[in-house]
Amino acid sequence: MKIKRDIVNKFKEWKDAAKHKPILLKGARQIGKTWAMEEFGKECFDYTAKFDFDRQKELLSAFTVSKEPARIIKELSLYSPVPLVPGKTLLIFDEIQECEEALNSLKYFCEEAPEWHIIAAGSLLGVAVKRRRMTVPVGKVQVMRMYPITFKEYLRASDIQTFNYVEQIEEPEKLSLIILDKLKSEYRRYMVSGGMPEAAVSMLENQGMQAVDDILQGILDLYELDFAKYADPREIPRIHALWRSLPAQLAKENRKFIYKVVKKGARSRDYEDALLWLEDAGMIYRVNAVSKPGMPLSAYEEADIFKVYASDCGLLRRLADLPGSIVIDQTANYTEFKGAMAENAVLQSLLPSYGSVPYYWSSEGKAEIEFLLQREDEIIPVEVKAENCVSGRSIVVYNERYHPKNRIRFSFLNLQRNSGMLACPSPLTEWAMKWLDK
């Protein structure tokens, strides 16, 4: 089974643009970057030439002989089983972090040979660039970020009829219970598998919970091997400890990140580099608090107050050793962590369309708004509730203080719009902004 990835549409827009720079594709390990690039090549080009700088060390010589694109292409043609023809061949530079000269060459292709279509990607690209002090040709590449499979992509593969029904909704009106139940059922399954392609496909093909867990555990094991391969040896124990503390951080009623949860007596200065490493690797998202919801939100960021979420809800579930059956069947003792999973899944759905990590707001422990989104000239408060539990005063406190024009509450209750409040089922997170002004 194939799961269509929306980023391929962005690649198509890039190809059709009058002018284009080489793409530098960023994203965590195992999210399907190589597959998406190759799929795009199959759909839109006569030929696809992939050069893997991790497996083909001999490719380095093609970039050390000359910086001229024409000469580089001539050298690369010796390693390509397909013709290299501008406009007809997609060039994929995979694992580009293993060849700094190839990364630098993107500047020259941008300036001197824009007729070539090049997408470069790499595992842990952000980490490698920092550690090896590599230079990214700023302004000469178009940076794109790829994320794990979203629920929208998952639903399109699992139930195309329900997907098409949702796509056609123009006004935020109540859904039939049949549609709502279908969405909730598929969403719970998605929260179990997450958006790592192999795990999501395993779930869609009904290979069983154990198969999904084995795949996710394999990815977690690979991530921890990456610590040893790419991190400073002095930081490896801290990265391990911080990463493994994530479930405990999110299981707290107040999900604010606390260093002492990582290790007794831990201080921020001891773990900041480890936290940055995990961010650069695309494994976590740091959601900072703001002192007040003012414009721009970045001006009110509180750097030392933040929450940390996993890049994928399936990986978070497996890291926490939470059985998938509990997520699907909603066992009674599944309480605080249910809220953490709900928030993580909503954040995961918001990021691809919103484009940047949001902020959050808290008022002396008395009220908290999970996410704040900045859209043009307004700040939109976003509440996330687990399942049908929507009680709480946080949004009331926020409304009384700041009087937002629009607000969103994600839960498992039905879709409706009422006096500036968009109540949206969590499975429909990616459609919410479309309905906000209706």
Where are these regions (language model features)?
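N-terminal pre-Walker A segment at the start of P-loop NTPase domains
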Residues: M1-D16
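Conserved lysine of the Walker
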Residues: K33
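Hydrophobic positions on the alpha1 helix immediately C-terminal to the Walker A/P-loop
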Residues: A36, F40
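Short glycine-rich substrate-engagement loop in P-loop NTPases that contacts/grips substrate
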Residues: R55-G87
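Conserved P-loop NTPase "ATPase switch" module shared by AAA+ and STAND
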Residues: L84-A102
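Structural recognition of the conserved hydrophobic beta-strand(s) that form the central parallel beta-sheet
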Residues: I92, H117-S123, R145
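Interdomain motor-coupling "hinge/lid" segment immediately C-terminal to the ATP-binding subdomain
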Residues: V129-A251
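Accessory nucleic acid-recognition modules appended to NTPase machines
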Residues: A200-Q374
